[in-house]
Amino acid sequence: MKKSILSTIAVLGVTLGDGAINSYAAEANPTAELTSEASLTIQPGILNLDAVSNFNFGELTIQDVAESDQTLTGTPEITKVSDYRGPNESGWMLSLKLSDIKNGNNVKLQSAKLNLATTRAKGDATVTATTTIDAGTTEPTLVASANGTTGLAANEFDLSNTTLTFPKQNINSGRYSGTVTWVLTNAYTPE
């Protein structure tokens, strides 16, 4: 019995010892592959009315106004709309209205009209070539719009041929001015 137990232990020892001695050689060119992610988030930009034009129509005398109808060319600046919302937006519209043109004593320039001659200096918007806006209007008048644009542009409008017209009239001297209200609407609605 002693012999069989010893031989079993010897066989087990050789078998177990054999497993501990075995090792495997490393491969010369191992291949391993894992994936990771590269990502970024692009936020939509904004639709913004960046700059609007002031209009200066110079000086006249009371005699000039009393004797003849007037057409005065202004010295405006650039008007600018930036649209960086991307191509899937509904478009936009730029309109304006003009208050009564009055002096410091609240005397109104009668029948004044702002004749906006708009050209696109840069961008992809559509402009209304000539628009007449009566002083004292309450509803804005469309001057430029964008529908189906890229949504990736700054749009500049040149208003250098804009005029102010009014008929001859009896008038007081003084500085006359009105408020031009620009309205940028975040939607396009054909008129």
Predicted segments with their positions:
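Low-complexity, intrinsically disordered/propeptide-like segments
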Residues: 9, 15, 19, 112, ...
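Sec-dependent N-terminal signal peptides of Gram-positive bacterial secreted proteins and lipoproteins
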Residues: 1-25
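Short, intrinsically disordered, low-complexity terminal segments
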Residues: 7, 22, 35, 141-143
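N-terminal small/polar-rich segments of proteins
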Residues: 24-122, 148-191
